[in-house]
Amino acid sequence: LVYRITGRYVILKRKPRQYTISGFVRDSASYESLIAATVVERSSGKGSVSNNYGFYSITLSPGKVVLSSSYVGYEPCSVTFELTCDTMIDLSLSPAGVLGEVVIKGISPRSDVLNSRVGVSDVPASRVKSLPALLGETDVVKTLQRLPGVTGGTEGMSGLFVRGGDGDDNLFLLDGNPVYHTDHVLGFFSAFNPDAVKNATFYKGSFPAEYGGRLSSVVDVRTNEGNRKEYHGNISIGLLAARANLEGPIIKDRSSFNVSVRRTWMELITWPLMTAVNKKADTEWKGGYHFYDMNAKVDYSFTDRS
């Protein structure tokens, strides 16, 4: 309640009721969620930032609302409506036109002060696939090994040693679920298929309160939800392994899937070695080591009725 004292009287007023606007911020082309998109109501100045699932929420007083959303690399979007009850509105942003490369050089005298996320690195999937890798096999963990304060030990291994810590001092999460065994083939491959990864957030210090149980670092890996508009697929063949990825809508603009599989053919490399060894050995040795894995994800947006 809101009250006001006038002489000997206390006048009570009912506090104006407020309503909540919530929804998801998505890419209009692929319908994937946009993380850390800005949503602002222009007249009041109140705003919010979308979370890891693209969800936002703002509480406002009833009346005319001008809701604006923006995200790096996308055209801003605005919606005007009358707020009379709790409302759910999804905002779709269109990718902005890409201009030619422009190089801007400058020196910030207080760059260390302006950056509030000390010890945090965001690694998108495009960066993982663009960096050179041993024998052409791209990998999230090997990309993190190139960051300052991180070493990977032996060349080709997928472990992380952050700021002098041990390999067991790191917390790996896949869509919020802990991953305890993070490598294959004695550490030559990590357990994260690059075709399934959307982005990875790497914390070297000042961990958020939601993470715990580790001393050195936290690696939060998020996987692709899949394209809700059209079907896409790709096949990649390397020296040591082959990968395939397929994504697309189950119900258009409502649900999607993303499936990624990979398999190595290291037995083709070890077979000549085993043949040479068996010619000189009394006992026949057999070696056909390989591995395969699969990542599958289904994303569905529920409504008030389903």
What are these regions (language model features)?
Residues 6-7, 43, 85, 154-156, ...:
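Residue-level recognition of beta-strand termini and adjacent short loop/turns
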Residues 61-63:
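A glycine-anchored, Pro-Gly-centered beta-turn/N-cap motif
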Residues 65-67:
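A short tyrosine-centered beta-strand micro-motif
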Residues 2-4, 46-49, 75, 103-168, ...:
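Periplasmic N-terminal accessory/gating domains of Gram-negative outer-membrane beta-barrel systems
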Residues 5-14, 18-42, 70-74, 84-132, ...:
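Short, acidic, small-residue-rich periplasmic hinge/interaction motif at the N-terminus
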Residues 55-59, 90-92:
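Exposed aromatic-hydrophobic patches
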Residues 171, 199-210, 216-224, 232-281, ...:
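Predominantly transmembrane beta-strands of Gram-negative outer membrane beta-barrel pores used
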Residues 43-55:
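Short, acidic Ser/Thr/Gly-rich low-complexity loop/linker segments typical of extracellular
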